[in-house]
């Protein structure tokens, strides 16, 4: 059954095995966030919109989510649109980005182009910004 295979893939991808018997109300904030994202993937979307997916997550969960985003884009061929204020976390897992300031685009391009952009540096990142 394709649906069962999809669910099993998501369980493995999001490392849900130890959590399968726990009710959602007892999950941590990061676990709940992963659950919501995984639920969006059940119906094989062509586009996935994530609003501040890295907010309030520990570093291990951020890294796992970054890897999932990269995998969704490269392997599953899903367009992932991420809106986030955490530039370092965001630029570590996307191939293109747009930087807004006061509702206007101030930079657009690959992560390496974005961090070199003088307007993005002065208004958003600062001179010492680096991607991990």
Language model feature labels by segment:
Residues 37:
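Hydrophobic anchor residue at the start of the ABC signature
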Residues 2-19, 70:
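Conserved ABC ATPase "signature" region
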Residues 63-75:
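Helical segment within the ABC ATPase nucleotide-binding domain
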Residues 23-27:
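Conserved ABC ATPase signature
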Residues 44:
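Conserved catalytic motifs of ABC-family nucleotide-binding domains
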Residues 48-51:
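Catalytic Walker B motif of ABC-type/P-loop ATPase nucleotide-binding domains
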């Amino acid at each position: 059954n394709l649906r069962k295979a999809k669910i099993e893939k998501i369980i493995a991808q999001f490392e849900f095995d130890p959590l399968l018997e726990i009710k959602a109300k007892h999950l941590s904030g990061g676990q709940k966030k992963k659950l919501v994202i995984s639920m969006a993937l059940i119906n094989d979307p062509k586009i996935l919109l994530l609003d501040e997916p890295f907010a309030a997550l520990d570093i291990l969960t951020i890294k796992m989510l970054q890897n999932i985003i990269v995998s969704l884009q490269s392997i599953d061929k899903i367009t992932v649109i991420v809106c986030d204020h955490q530039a370092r976390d965001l630029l570590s897992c996307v191939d293109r980005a747009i930087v807004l300031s006061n509702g206007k685009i101030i930079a657009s391009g690959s992560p390496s182009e974005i961090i070199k952009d003088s307007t993005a540096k002065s208004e958003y990142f600062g001179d010492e910004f680096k991607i991990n």
